[in-house]
A protein has these predicted regions:
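Membrane-embedded alpha-helical bundles of polytopic integral membrane proteins
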Residues: 1-127
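Acidic (Asp/Glu-rich) catalytic motifs at the cytosolic membrane interface
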Residues: 64-80, 93, 97, 130-172
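Hydrophobic transmembrane alpha-helices of multi-pass small-molecule transporters
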Residues: 103-104, 164, 171, 180
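A general structural signal for short secondary-structure boundary/capping elements
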Residues: 107-108, 174-176
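Short, conserved aromatic-histidine micro-motifs
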Residues: 120-121, 165, 184
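Juxtamembrane boundary at the C-terminal end of a transmembrane helix
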Residues: 177-184
Length: 184
């Protein structure tokens, strides 16, 4: 609320709508999305579920990161068909599907970290993989629009720290609300 007012008070209203929209999206992706990590820790204890919020947080972060890695590996190994060449030219259908399948299988074996039944763990794991891909390509589109190539090079061929957490901006709220709806 303060930032648009500051522009108005300066008399700098040219492009204010675009500036406000950009600010809102940045806040949505960074603050709103990532804040759901903390919400997981505040969920009440469930009878018979000893991992609590820490287990949920570990499940979410691990699956989100393993999904990114698996999509990268499967794309490198088998990738032939580009999925979004104008937005993220290295993403392939083979990488996407390999990542979804791998993440779902790994999620099934890590289901003990959640209060979910096996069918729900499978569903949630698959949806996390899809949400992670969505977050990754949306951030890629924003970076492309703003002329930003990579957010760093701490992991060769995989970008910097922000590139490691871009998927979490989508997976965190999806996971929180699915778990809350299904288990609480």
């Amino acid at each position: 609320l303060v930032l648009p007012l500051r522009l108005v008070l300066k008399g700098d209203t040219h492009g204010i709508t675009k500036s406000m929209a950009l600010l809102q999206w940045i806040l949505m992706l960074s603050v709103f999305g990532i804040s759901h990590l903390a919400y997981l820790l505040s969920l009440p204890e469930l009878p018979g579920f000893s991992s609590g919020g820490r287990g949920l947080l570990l499940f979410l972060v691990f699956l989100t990161e393993i999904n990114d890695i698996m999509q990268f590996i499967w794309g490198k190994l088998l990738g032939r068909h580009k999925i979004l060449p104008k937005v993220s030219p290295n993403k392939t259908w083979e990488g996407f599907l390999g990542g979804v399948i791998s993440t779902t299988v790994i999620g099934y074996f890590l289901g003990f970290l959640t209060p979910l039944s096996a069918p729900n763990v499978i569903l949630v794991s698959a949806l996390l993989a899809i949400a992670g891909f969505s977050g990754d390509v949306v951030i890629s589109a924003i970076k492309r629009d703003k002329g930003i190539k990579d957010m760093g090079n701490s992991i060769p061929g995989h970008g910097g720290v922000f590139d490691r957490i871009d998927s979490l901006s989508y997976t965190a709220p999806v996971f929180f609300h699915l778990v809350y709806y299904i288990a609480y």
